[in-house]
């Protein structure tokens, strides 16, 4: 299991808990996410 997969899974789980499962895993641009180690290029 790569660290990127863990990161994406953690972020997806975070989004489902906060916004609901319908929300894309990319956080909304209302506020920054400074704790992210990097910004995925999508």
Swiss-Prot record:
Give the GO molecular function terms. hydroxyapatite binding
Feature: compositional bias, Pro residues: 24-42
One GO BP annotation of this record: regulation of bone mineralization
Protein location:
Secreted
Disordered: annotated segments = 18-42
Residues covered by region (Hydroxyapatite-binding)? 1-6
Pfam families (UniProt xref): Statherin
Q: Where is this region: Hydrophobic?
A: 18-42
- Keywords recorded for this protein, A-Z: Biomineralization, Phosphoprotein, Secreted
Tell me the residues on which Phosphoserine occurs. 2-3
Major localization listed first in the record, in broad terms: secreted
> GO CC terms on record?
extracellular region
What is known about the tissue distribution of this protein?
A: Secreted by parotid and submandibular glands.
Q: Which domain of life is it from?
A: Eukaryota
Which family does the entry's similarity section mention?
Answer: Belongs to the histatin/statherin family.
Write out the function statement from the record: Salivary protein that stabilizes saliva supersaturated with calcium salts by inhibiting the precipitation of calcium phosphate salts. It also modulates hydroxyapatite crystal formation on the tooth surface.
Any idea what this protein is called? Answer: Statherin
Native species: Macaca arctoides
């Amino acid at each position: 299991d790569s660290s990127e997969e863990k990161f994406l899974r953690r972020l997806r789980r975070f989004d489902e808990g906060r916004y609901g499962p319908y929300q894309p895993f990319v956080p909304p641009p209302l506020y920054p996410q400074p704790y992210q180690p990097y910004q995925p290029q999508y």
